[in-house]
Regions:
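Short beta-strand/loop motifs in extracellular/secreted proteins, especially
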Residues: 4
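Periplasmic OmpA-like peptidoglycan-binding domain that tethers envelope proteins to the cell wall
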Residues: 9-79
Length: 79
């Protein structure tokens, strides 16, 4: 299947410095975007973005929440 755009958004938990988390979330997004391309996902454009600890999906107060916040989200946009 071919997509117009694929957005790959990387996130971290709140542990560590802002600079470290920003760089880590970018590496995560870039790695997933590369994996998708290498495994045949076709798109006119790939966008990998770093969000660091912004927009947590769980509390960073507990280990389980921090684990959920260390994630990559993929959005596929049709033509």
């Amino acid at each position: 299947m071919h997509f117009a755009r694929v957005d790959v958004d990387g996130y971290t938990d709140s542990t560590g410095s802002a600079a470290h988390n920003q760089a880590l979330s970018k590496r995560r997004a870039d790695a997933v975007a590369a994996y998708l391309r290498e495994h045949g996902l076709q798109a006119d454009a790939f966008a990998a973005a770093a969000h660091g600890p912004a927009n947590p999906v769980a509390s960073n107060d507990m280990q389980e929440g921090r684990a959920r916040n260390r994630r990559v989200e993929i959005s596929l946009h049709a033509q």
